[in-house]
């Protein structure tokens, strides 16, 4: 049989997938460290006991206990909540539900979380960027100029990796600019560290507002892969049309419901208080470290800092088993490294290693 016209497996793939650069998650980048401060995880494990043993049956698409517990915690109605495999799936669901490949676009404001771009590219949806201003706030004029053909605008607040909140008045202006034109997705993955800044109370005013949440950060359940989308019922019903039939396994739903119990939420708030205390300790120490040029304000469980020689610092700590997140390739973040707030022992190891660096 002739093989002249036979395509390779790669040739059979969609062109945009062949050209896709996958998201470089902390785990994908690897490393052989014993101090992992590169993925904004909680530094110690939380223990749960599995109570659901009926693993021979398929789980509910939207487990009732999880939905009701999260709705009560977030101060919304159960009909306004969708649970998914992490907030990353929520990003993809919104794009799939609202964007026509080859026709519509998403918009985001770098430097910010990389999965908005990767999800859109995977789905064949155009990506538009409006870089943040020098203070990392929204360029509202730039966004306004790019709304024609844009169906979804992603805003991360507090923003990853910079750590700051987006000005609430700017968010209101954005929601007014996009009313009747586009969905606005507010990524609140880190909102537990600044709960006063949540936009959940705005859902009644803005039918096109969507909020993303996760159990990966303050709830210390990054390995669970459980996230939430909060929106008005009309939006949730559209997302339910495109979600997989069984997004959460029975053990995941079991643990998530426990984490969202009154006891679980109290434990989360204790972890937040502990993290905020350690964050201030780390900020103070970094500000007194010679190789650190600037420490940026943070409303999260991580700190962004600019270094005099970030590449050599990153490699030096990597070689010592201290794994940070290099942000040099992000727009306007030259010389910056992101440091997750760890335990006191981990934070001290970072400081000791940095103070041993040549200046």
Swiss-Prot record:
Reactions accelerated catalytically: L-histidinol phosphate + 2-oxoglutarate = 3-(imidazol-4-yl)-2-oxopropyl phosphate + L-glutamate
Domain of life: Bacteria
Pathway(s) per entry: Amino-acid biosynthesis; L-histidine biosynthesis; L-histidine from 5-phospho-alpha-D-ribose 1-diphosphate: step 7/9
One function term, GO molecular function aspect: pyridoxal phosphate binding
Enzyme Commission code: 2.6.1.9
InterPro entries noted in UniProt: Aminotrans_II_pyridoxalP_BS, Aminotransferase_I/II_large, HisP_aminotrans, PyrdxlP-dep_Trfase, PyrdxlP-dep_Trfase_major, PyrdxlP-dep_Trfase_small
Keyword 4Fe-4S listed: no
Listed cofactors: pyridoxal 5'-phosphate
Keywords: Amino-acid biosynthesis, Aminotransferase, Histidine biosynthesis, Pyridoxal phosphate, Transferase
GO biological process: L-histidine biosynthetic process
N6-(pyridoxal phosphate)lysine modified-residue sites: 217
Residue intervals passing through the bilayer: none
Family note: Belongs to the class-II pyridoxal-phosphate-dependent aminotransferase family. Histidinol-phosphate aminotransferase subfamily.
Xref: NCBIfam families: hisC (TIGR01141)
Subunit comment: Homodimer.
Name of the protein in its database record: Histidinol-phosphate aminotransferase
Annotated organism of origin: Salmonella dublin (strain CT_02021853)
């Amino acid at each position: 049989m002739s093989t002249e016209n036979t395509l390779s497996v790669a040739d059979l793939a969609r062109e945009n997938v062949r050209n896709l650069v996958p998201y470089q998650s902390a785990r994908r980048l690897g490393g052989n460290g014993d101090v992992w401060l590169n993925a904004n995880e909680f530094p110690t494990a939380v223990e749960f006991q599995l109570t659901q043993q009926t693993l021979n049956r398929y789980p509910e698409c939207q487990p009732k206990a999880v939905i009701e517990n999260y709705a009560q915690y977030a101060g919304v109605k159960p009909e306004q909540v969708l649970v998914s495999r992490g907030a990353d799936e929520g990003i993809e669901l919104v794009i799939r539900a609202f964007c026509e490949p080859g026709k519509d676009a998403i918009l985001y404001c770098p430097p910010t979380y990389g999965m908005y771009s990767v999800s859109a590219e995977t789905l064949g949806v155009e990506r538009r960027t409006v870089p943040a201003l020098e203070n990392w706030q929204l360029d509202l004029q730039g966004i306004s100029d790019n709304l024609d053909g844009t169906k979804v605008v992603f805003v991360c607040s507090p923003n990853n990796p910079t750590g700051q909140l987006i000005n609430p008045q700017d968010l209101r202006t954005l929601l007014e600019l996009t009313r009747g034109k586009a969905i606005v997705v507010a990524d609140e993955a880190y909102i537990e560290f600044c709960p006063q800044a949540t936009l959940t109370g705005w859902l009644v005013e803005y039918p096109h507002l969507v909020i993303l949440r996760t159990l990966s950060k303050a709830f210390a359940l990054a390995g669970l892969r459980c996230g939430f989308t909060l929106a008005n019922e009309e939006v949730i019903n559209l997302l339910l049309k495109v979600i997989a039939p069984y997004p959460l396994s029975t053990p995941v739903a079991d643990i998530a419901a426990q984490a969202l119990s009154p006891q679980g939420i109290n434990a989360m708030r204790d972890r937040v208080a502990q993290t905020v205390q350690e964050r201030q300790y780390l900020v103070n120490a970094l500000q007194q470290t010679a190789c650190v040029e600037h420490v940026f304000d943070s409303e999260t469980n991580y700190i962004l800092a600019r270094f005099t020689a970030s590449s050599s610092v990153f490699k030096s700590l990597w070689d010592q088993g201290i794994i940070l997140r290099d942000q040099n390739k992000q727009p306007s973040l030259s010389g910056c490294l992101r440091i997750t707030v760890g335990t006191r022992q981990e934070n001290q190891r970072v400081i000791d290693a940095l103070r041993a660096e040549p200046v």
